A protein has these predicted regions:
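Cytosolic, long alpha-helical scaffolding segments
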Residues: 1-174
Length: 174
């Protein structure tokens, strides 16, 4: 009887790990796209996003059909949603860059690399969650530190963007 609960627990861990793996692969494609601007890479990223969405749908279906979960169902749902947000944003960024014909700047490439590193830490965290929760926490903290670096870098860049916007506005009036 207890073997049934163990198998159900493993389903959730496996699905979260799969979602994090696909997301990490997707963010690596974001970095690669920024290096090459290759449309095939953009298409690969779009496929990864769809794969990640499918894994998330299966996870939600499993959550809805299960009474006992390895940890709080809202936490599982929130973790999955957060991982999904990462690949969604990567895909939408590349899609918009393709449509708007925007070339990545060195700043954008640095941010993408930091995001890739954070996605790797998230991937490592969910890999370790079941058997080594303390190690998983270390990886999660590293991911958070990388997120903070992205936010700090963005905050430093905002005044430059604002100045660029003012110049663009002035030029567009001419």
């Amino acid at each position: 009887m207890f073997g049934f609960f163990k198998k159900r627990e493993e389903v959730f861990h496996r699905l979260i790990q799969e979602q994090a793996s696909i997301t990490y692969d997707g963010v690596k494609l974001l970095v690669k796209y920024f290096e090459t601007q290759d449309r095939e890479i953009a298409e690969e990223l779009a496929l990864k996003e769809k794969q990640a969405d499918e894994v998330r749908r299966i996870l939600i279906d499993e959550l809805n059909g299960t009474f006992v979960t390895p940890f709080d169902r809202e936490d599982i749902f929130a973790l999955s949603r957060s991982i999904d947000d990462v690949i969604d944003y990567a895909d939408s960024t590349v899609s918009e860059m393709v449509v708007l014909k925007v070339n990545p700047t060195p700043y954008m490439q640095r941010i993408a690399t930091l995001l890739k590193d954070a996605a790797y830490e998230i991937f490592q965290a969910v890999q370790r969650l079941q058997k080594n929760p303390a190690v998983a926490i270390d990886h999660a903290q590293r991911a958070k530190a990388l997120e903070n670096r992205v936010e700090e870098s963005t905050a430093r860049r905002l005044p430059i963007c604002s100045a660029d916007r003012k110049i663009f506005t002035m030029l567009s009036r001419c």
